[in-house]
Amino acid sequence: MGDETIKVAILGSGNIGTDLMYKLLDCPASMELVLLAGIDPNSEGLARARALGVAASAQGIDAVLEHPDIQIVFDATSAKAHVRHAKLLRETGRTAIDLTPAARGPYVVPPVNLRQHLDAPNVNLITCGGQATIPLVYAVSRVTPVRYAEIVSTVASRSAGPGTRQNIDEFTFTTAHGLEVIGGAQQGKAIIILNPAEPPILMRNTVYALPEDDFDPAQVRDSIEAMVAEVQQYVPGYRLKNPPVFDMRDTPWGRKSAVTVLLEVEGAGHFLPTYAGNLDIMTASARRVGDVFARHLLSRREVAV
C-alpha cells in the first residue's frame, strides 16, 4: 500500500486482538496491518493471522519494536502489560491505542472528544460500558447540564472472560469517571451485570440522566438520536430499544424530570459471536480511533512534503 497508508500493529492475540485484526483487514484504507504480536506461539489468533497473510509473532512488544515503520500500535493485552508497553512505545515515537484499563493516556470516545487528542501519544478506550453509554450522557449534557448520570450494562456471561471478571471494580470506577469527565455529568455511577442466560443475550444498557434544570424534551430527544446515528457509523449494531423516556422523579436534589434511555449493542460477528456486543464495541471503537489517527498522520505527511 506504500506511502498512502499508516502501518499499524496489534499487541495481543486473544479474542479482542483477533477480532480487531479482522476489522482492520475489512475496512479502513488509511491503515495497513503489518503485524499481530502475542506471547503464546500456539494461540488461535496468531494462526489465523498467518492464514490471512498477516505477519505473526509470539515475541510480544519486542516484535513491534523491531519494525521501525510501525506508527500506530493497538494494545489488547492487559493493564499490567500496557504500563510497560506504553513507556516503550512512547520512547520509540509510536502512537498507542489502549484497549486495557491501564489509562496511561486521556480517555477517548470517538464521537465526543477524539478530535481533541489527535496528537496524543497514548489514548485509552475506557470500557465497553463507557463506549456504549458515555455518548448518550454527553448527548443530554450538550443540551442541558446533567446533575447525575447512572448506567447499567448487562452483558452475556459467556462474553466475559477472566480479565473482565477480575476487573469489575475497575470497570465501575473507570466508567463512572468517564461519565463525568467526558459525558459531562456532575456525578456518575456505573453498574455491570453478567447475565448467565442461555442462549446468550445481546449487550443491553440502561442510561439514566438527571438534568440540573428544566429542559426541552424534544431537544434532548433530537440530540440523543443524532448521537446514536454517529455511533452507528462505526458500530452498526448500536441501537435504541425504545425512544427516550421522560418522567418526574423524587431525587436527593428534589423532584426533577429524568431521562431514561434503553440501548442494545449487537456485534458484527467478524470473529466474536454477535451476542458479544460489549467486546465488539471496543474493537469497533479502536478501529475508528485508529482510522482518524492515521488520516491525521497522513495529512501531516502531506503538509511536510
Curated annotation (Swiss-Prot):
<dbReference type="InterPro" id="IPR015426">
    <property type="entry name" value="Acetylaldehyde_DH_C"/>
</dbReference>
<dbReference type="Pfam" id="PF01118">
    <property type="entry name" value="Semialdhyde_dh"/>
</dbReference>
<feature type="active site" description="Acyl-thioester intermediate">
    <location>
        <position position="128"/>
    </location>
</feature>
<dbReference type="InterPro" id="IPR000534">
    <property type="entry name" value="Semialdehyde_DH_NAD-bd"/>
</dbReference>
<dbReference type="InterPro" id="IPR003361">
    <property type="entry name" value="Acetaldehyde_dehydrogenase"/>
</dbReference>
<protein>
    <recommendedName>
        <fullName>Acetaldehyde dehydrogenase</fullName>
        <ecNumber>1.2.1.10</ecNumber>
    </recommendedName>
</protein>
<dbReference type="InterPro" id="IPR036291">
    <property type="entry name" value="NAD(P)-bd_dom_sf"/>
</dbReference>
<dbReference type="GO" id="GO:0051287">
    <property type="term" value="F:NAD binding"/>
</dbReference>
<feature type="binding site">
    <location>
        <position position="278"/>
    </location>
    <ligand>
        <name>NAD(+)</name>
    </ligand>
</feature>
<comment type="similarity">
    <text>Belongs to the acetaldehyde dehydrogenase family.</text>
</comment>
<dbReference type="GO" id="GO:0009056">
    <property type="term" value="P:catabolic process"/>
</dbReference>
<dbReference type="GO" id="GO:0008774">
    <property type="term" value="F:acetaldehyde dehydrogenase (acetylating) activity"/>
</dbReference>
<keyword id="KW-0058">Aromatic hydrocarbons catabolism</keyword>
<keyword id="KW-0560">Oxidoreductase</keyword>
<feature type="binding site">
    <location>
        <begin position="13"/>
        <end position="16"/>
    </location>
    <ligand>
        <name>NAD(+)</name>
    </ligand>
</feature>
<feature type="binding site">
    <location>
        <begin position="159"/>
        <end position="167"/>
    </location>
    <ligand>
        <name>NAD(+)</name>
    </ligand>
</feature>
<dbReference type="Pfam" id="PF09290">
    <property type="entry name" value="AcetDehyd-dimer"/>
</dbReference>
<keyword id="KW-0520">NAD</keyword>
